[in-house]
Amino acid sequence: FAQIKGGLIVSCQALETEPLYSSKIMARMAFAAKEGGAVGIRANTPEDIIAIKKEVDLPVIGLYKVDYDNSEIYITPTMKEIDAIMTAAPDIIALDATNRKRPDGSTIETFFPEVRKKYPDMIFMADCASYEDGMRAQKLGFDIVGTTLCGYTPDTKGTEIPCFPMLEKLAQDLTIPLIAEGGIWEPQQLQKAFA
Protein backbone atom coordinates (compact mmCIF):
# COMPACT_ATOMS: atom_id res chain seq x y z
CA PHE A 1 0.00 0.00 0.00
CA ALA A 2 2.94 2.32 0.58
CA GLN A 3 3.50 2.66 -3.17
CA ILE A 4 -0.01 4.07 -3.76
CA LYS A 5 -0.53 6.04 -0.54
CA GLY A 6 -1.27 9.69 -1.21
CA GLY A 7 -1.32 9.25 -4.98
CA LEU A 8 -3.81 9.01 -7.81
CA ILE A 9 -5.13 5.60 -8.85
CA VAL A 10 -6.63 5.67 -12.34
CA SER A 11 -9.45 3.37 -13.39
CA CYS A 12 -8.77 1.88 -16.83
CA GLN A 13 -11.96 0.01 -17.61
CA ALA A 14 -14.31 -0.37 -20.57
CA LEU A 15 -17.25 -2.73 -20.77
CA GLU A 16 -18.11 -4.81 -23.83
CA THR A 17 -20.77 -2.29 -24.88
CA GLU A 18 -18.36 0.67 -24.77
CA PRO A 19 -16.22 1.99 -27.66
CA LEU A 20 -12.83 1.53 -25.96
CA TYR A 21 -13.47 -2.11 -25.03
CA SER A 22 -10.17 -3.92 -25.64
CA SER A 23 -7.41 -5.20 -23.36
CA LYS A 24 -4.86 -3.61 -25.68
CA ILE A 25 -6.58 -0.21 -25.40
CA MET A 26 -6.85 -0.51 -21.60
CA ALA A 27 -3.13 -1.31 -21.42
CA ARG A 28 -2.33 1.82 -23.45
CA MET A 29 -4.64 3.87 -21.22
CA ALA A 30 -2.76 2.53 -18.20
CA PHE A 31 0.50 3.56 -19.85
CA ALA A 32 -0.89 7.05 -20.44
CA ALA A 33 -2.09 7.19 -16.82
CA LYS A 34 1.40 6.27 -15.61
CA GLU A 35 2.92 8.93 -17.85
CA GLY A 36 0.50 11.40 -16.26
CA GLY A 37 1.63 10.50 -12.73
CA ALA A 38 -0.74 7.73 -11.64
CA VAL A 39 0.61 5.52 -8.85
CA GLY A 40 -1.81 2.65 -9.44
CA ILE A 41 -4.39 1.26 -11.86
CA ARG A 42 -7.86 -0.20 -11.24
CA ALA A 43 -8.76 -2.75 -13.93
CA ASN A 44 -11.67 -5.04 -14.83
CA THR A 45 -11.33 -8.65 -16.10
CA PRO A 46 -8.38 -11.03 -15.95
CA GLU A 47 -7.52 -10.25 -19.59
CA ASP A 48 -7.24 -6.51 -18.96
CA ILE A 49 -5.25 -7.04 -15.76
CA ILE A 50 -2.73 -9.25 -17.60
CA ALA A 51 -2.39 -6.77 -20.49
CA ILE A 52 -1.96 -3.82 -18.11
CA LYS A 53 0.65 -5.59 -15.98
CA LYS A 54 2.67 -6.26 -19.15
CA GLU A 55 2.50 -2.56 -20.07
CA VAL A 56 3.14 -0.82 -16.72
CA ASP A 57 4.92 -1.64 -13.48
CA LEU A 58 2.30 -0.02 -11.25
CA PRO A 59 0.20 -1.82 -8.63
CA VAL A 60 -3.05 -3.09 -10.14
CA ILE A 61 -6.35 -3.31 -8.27
CA GLY A 62 -8.19 -6.07 -10.09
CA LEU A 63 -11.91 -6.68 -10.19
CA TYR A 64 -14.34 -8.56 -12.38
CA LYS A 65 -17.70 -7.02 -13.26
CA VAL A 66 -20.32 -9.66 -13.96
CA ASP A 67 -24.09 -9.20 -14.02
CA TYR A 68 -26.23 -11.89 -12.42
CA ASP A 69 -30.02 -11.87 -12.80
CA ASN A 70 -30.63 -12.61 -9.11
CA SER A 71 -28.34 -10.01 -7.51
CA GLU A 72 -27.56 -6.29 -7.71
CA ILE A 73 -23.91 -7.05 -6.92
CA TYR A 74 -21.70 -6.96 -10.01
CA ILE A 75 -18.19 -6.09 -8.76
CA THR A 76 -16.45 -9.43 -8.20
CA PRO A 77 -19.70 -11.03 -6.99
CA THR A 78 -18.70 -14.69 -6.51
CA MET A 79 -15.74 -16.96 -5.82
CA LYS A 80 -15.74 -17.82 -9.54
CA GLU A 81 -14.70 -14.25 -10.37
CA ILE A 82 -12.13 -14.13 -7.59
CA ASP A 83 -10.58 -17.38 -8.83
CA ALA A 84 -10.45 -15.96 -12.36
CA ILE A 85 -8.81 -12.71 -11.21
CA MET A 86 -6.21 -14.63 -9.21
CA THR A 87 -4.94 -16.16 -12.48
CA ALA A 88 -4.00 -12.62 -13.59
CA ALA A 89 -1.92 -11.95 -10.44
CA PRO A 90 -3.26 -8.52 -9.44
CA ASP A 91 -1.68 -6.75 -6.48
CA ILE A 92 -5.08 -6.13 -4.86
CA ILE A 93 -8.54 -7.57 -5.50
CA ALA A 94 -11.60 -5.33 -5.12
CA LEU A 95 -15.05 -6.68 -4.39
CA ASP A 96 -18.46 -5.34 -3.46
CA ALA A 97 -18.62 -5.20 0.34
CA THR A 98 -22.14 -3.84 0.68
CA ASN A 99 -24.67 -5.69 2.80
CA ARG A 100 -26.71 -6.92 -0.17
CA LYS A 101 -27.37 -10.51 -1.22
CA ARG A 102 -24.79 -12.02 -3.54
CA PRO A 103 -25.80 -14.29 -6.46
CA ASP A 104 -25.39 -17.40 -4.29
CA GLY A 105 -27.61 -15.89 -1.58
CA SER A 106 -24.74 -15.15 0.80
CA THR A 107 -23.88 -11.77 2.29
CA ILE A 108 -20.45 -10.20 2.64
CA GLU A 109 -20.38 -11.44 6.25
CA THR A 110 -20.50 -15.08 5.15
CA PHE A 111 -18.78 -14.73 1.76
CA PHE A 112 -15.62 -12.83 2.67
CA PRO A 113 -14.40 -15.25 5.37
CA GLU A 114 -14.44 -17.99 2.69
CA VAL A 115 -12.47 -15.74 0.34
CA ARG A 116 -9.90 -14.89 3.02
CA LYS A 117 -9.52 -18.56 3.94
CA LYS A 118 -8.90 -19.54 0.30
CA TYR A 119 -6.51 -16.63 -0.40
CA PRO A 120 -4.97 -15.65 2.96
CA ASP A 121 -2.06 -13.68 1.46
CA MET A 122 -3.99 -11.58 -1.07
CA ILE A 123 -4.74 -7.93 -0.34
CA PHE A 124 -8.48 -7.28 -0.55
CA MET A 125 -10.23 -3.95 -1.07
CA ALA A 126 -13.81 -3.48 0.11
CA ASP A 127 -15.90 -1.47 -2.35
CA CYS A 128 -18.35 0.24 0.01
CA ALA A 129 -21.47 2.39 -0.28
CA SER A 130 -21.76 3.60 3.31
CA TYR A 131 -19.90 4.26 6.53
CA GLU A 132 -21.41 1.08 7.98
CA ASP A 133 -20.11 -0.96 5.02
CA GLY A 134 -16.60 0.36 5.62
CA MET A 135 -16.58 -0.38 9.34
CA ARG A 136 -18.03 -3.86 8.71
CA ALA A 137 -15.34 -4.52 6.09
CA GLN A 138 -12.60 -3.64 8.55
CA LYS A 139 -14.13 -5.97 11.14
CA LEU A 140 -14.32 -8.77 8.55
CA GLY A 141 -10.61 -8.46 7.80
CA PHE A 142 -10.44 -6.49 4.56
CA ASP A 143 -7.11 -4.73 4.02
CA ILE A 144 -8.41 -1.56 2.34
CA VAL A 145 -11.75 0.27 2.24
CA GLY A 146 -12.92 2.27 -0.78
CA THR A 147 -15.88 4.63 -1.15
CA THR A 148 -16.51 3.12 -4.59
CA LEU A 149 -20.24 2.41 -4.37
CA CYS A 150 -21.48 5.49 -2.50
CA GLY A 151 -24.31 6.86 -4.60
CA TYR A 152 -24.66 3.69 -6.66
CA THR A 153 -26.79 1.44 -4.45
CA PRO A 154 -30.53 1.71 -3.70
CA ASP A 155 -29.75 2.91 -0.15
CA THR A 156 -27.34 5.62 -1.32
CA LYS A 157 -28.91 6.63 -4.64
CA GLY A 158 -29.10 10.41 -4.88
CA THR A 159 -26.14 10.92 -2.53
CA GLU A 160 -23.83 13.60 -3.86
CA ILE A 161 -20.53 12.20 -5.07
CA PRO A 162 -17.76 12.33 -4.16
CA CYS A 163 -19.16 11.28 -0.78
CA PHE A 164 -17.06 13.60 1.37
CA PRO A 165 -19.06 13.16 4.63
CA MET A 166 -18.64 9.36 4.41
CA LEU A 167 -14.97 9.77 3.51
CA GLU A 168 -14.30 12.10 6.45
CA LYS A 169 -16.01 9.83 8.96
CA LEU A 170 -14.25 6.70 7.70
CA ALA A 171 -10.89 8.50 7.73
CA GLN A 172 -11.43 9.25 11.43
CA ASP A 173 -12.58 5.77 12.46
CA LEU A 174 -10.78 3.21 10.28
CA THR A 175 -7.42 1.77 11.24
CA ILE A 176 -6.85 0.31 7.75
CA PRO A 177 -6.11 2.29 4.56
CA LEU A 178 -8.94 4.21 2.90
CA ILE A 179 -9.24 4.99 -0.81
CA ALA A 180 -11.45 7.88 -1.93
CA GLU A 181 -13.13 6.61 -5.07
CA GLY A 182 -15.94 7.77 -7.26
CA GLY A 183 -16.95 11.13 -8.66
CA ILE A 184 -13.56 12.80 -8.39
CA TRP A 185 -13.32 14.71 -11.66
CA GLU A 186 -11.58 17.95 -10.76
CA PRO A 187 -8.30 18.85 -9.01
CA GLN A 188 -10.21 20.71 -6.26
CA GLN A 189 -12.16 17.54 -5.43
CA LEU A 190 -8.92 15.57 -5.24
CA GLN A 191 -7.38 18.17 -2.92
CA LYS A 192 -10.45 18.01 -0.68
CA ALA A 193 -10.26 14.20 -0.59
CA PHE A 194 -6.66 14.38 0.60
CA ALA A 195 -7.40 17.09 3.20
What do the predicted segments below correspond to?
Residues F1-Y21:
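N-terminal amphipathic alpha-helix/helix-capping segment at the start of soluble metabolic enzymes
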Residues K5-V10, V56-N70, F111, R116-A129, ...:
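Short beta-strand/loop segments at the ligand-binding rim of alpha/beta enzyme cores
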Residues I9, G40-R42, I61, I93-D96, ...:
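Conserved beta-strand positions in the central sheet of alpha/beta enzyme cores
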Residues S23-A27, Y74-K80, S106-F112, T159-L167:
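Charged helix-capping and loop-helix junction motifs
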Residues S71-I85, A129-D143, I176-A180, I184-A195:
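Catalytic cores of alpha/beta
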